[in-house]
């Protein structure tokens, strides 16, 4: 448990490490005990940032989850969520790289940031307003998902 918590603390402290290892954090977060509670609390984050739920016959996934349960890793979920709240904005895709003016993924990532950390969302939004003010479809998709 100490090594897991140490790794999570490293991710929280260093954004470069977070950017490199966020897919592993996503897998860990979805495998941790009680991670299903995130589905109700942060539905867009759960759908956008975390990997899709595996099938019941996914042996490796079941093995990881049972191992984490045996380790009593449940409290690690709070630390993992602290890391996400701190750094999720770093992996939001840049609208400048959108394909055919489809910004629905960008809007979903923004909504996920909004769910976890409203201050960071406000900062990201102000940056986007300056940089992407002329992308009407971006703002349309943001509005459609409930953001402005």
Per-segment meaning from a language model:
Residues 1-148:
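Eukaryote-biased, non-catalytic alpha-solenoid scaffold regions
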């Amino acid at each position: 448990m100490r090594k897991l918590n140490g790794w999570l603390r490293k991710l929280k402290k260093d954004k470069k490490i977070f950017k490199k290892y966020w897919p592993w954090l996503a897998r860990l977060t979805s495998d941790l005990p009680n991670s299903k509670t995130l589905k109700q609390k942060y539905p867009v984050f759960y759908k956008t940032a975390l990997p899709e739920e595996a099938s019941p016959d996914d042996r490796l996934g079941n093995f990881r989850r049972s191992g984490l349960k045996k380790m009593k890793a449940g409290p690690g979920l709070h630390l993992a969520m602290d890391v996400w709240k701190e750094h999720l904005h770093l992996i939001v895709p840049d609208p400048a790289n959108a394909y055919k003016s489809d910004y629905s993924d960008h809007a979903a990532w923004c909504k996920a940031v909004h769910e976890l950390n409203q201050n960071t969302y406000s900062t990201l939004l102000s940056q986007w307003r300056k940089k992407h003010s002329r992308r009407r479809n971006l703002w349309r998709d943001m509005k459609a998902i409930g953001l402005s």
